[in-house]
Amino acid sequence: MWRTVLVIFSLLYAVCAGAVTPGTDKITLSDLDNVIRNAQNYDKVREERLDSCRTALARSKSLEQRCLIYFDMRHTFDRYRTDSATFYALRSLEAAKALGRPDYVGSSSIALAKQYQTSGMSYDALATLNRVDRSGLSDKDKEEMYLFYMSIYESLEGLSMDKSLKQYYSSKAREYKDSIVSQFPDNVTIKSESLVVEGDYKSALEMLLKKYESLSPEAIETGPVDIAIADIYLKIGWRDAATEYMIA
């Protein structure tokens, strides 16, 4: 149990200690399983993590340090206190703009859009993404943003009752899917779809499960990969397995 606490603490402590920049943290599935089994310990460590961040924030001597701390506090609050997470996402974005760092602005904008989507504010998420200067994004951030766009439009398509709107959202989702295929041909979510069309469910599952294990829970790719895995399990009739990957 204490190994779990130490693992979590080391993962959560990194940015406030100055060791991590946006988008670099990874959590293995075994670590995540241990976190779920020891949820009470995780809550305690998370509060300690936030206290550490607050202390680091009070002692910070540069805008860049504050930007990274805000970014990490947003991540720590994610799905825990969404209002606090949104607050720190906004502070991170403000600091990134003041720094004039396009890479930080891109990462912070995507993080803020994610908070809006988590809160059910799809249109605010889209508006935030639409303001991002794509020329300043890394290839990784651009791929994640396209996946996020696709995910939002697919979600809106499923929720819309208006036929013309459903068609519009569907066309936008396809547009971003096509962009991913052309610009990021190694994207496993898209490649797995081709394997499914060919009837090779085994290879598609192996590819997706391997990718899933490499992702941190908060990674934007996690949602599309979850959905793709669940869809394959449903297609082959493994409903119990599918429920493990269905996301709310």
Regions found by a protein language model. Give the residues of each.
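Bacterial N-terminal signal peptides that target proteins for export
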Residues: M1-L6
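A "functional boundary" signal
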Residues: I8, C16-A248
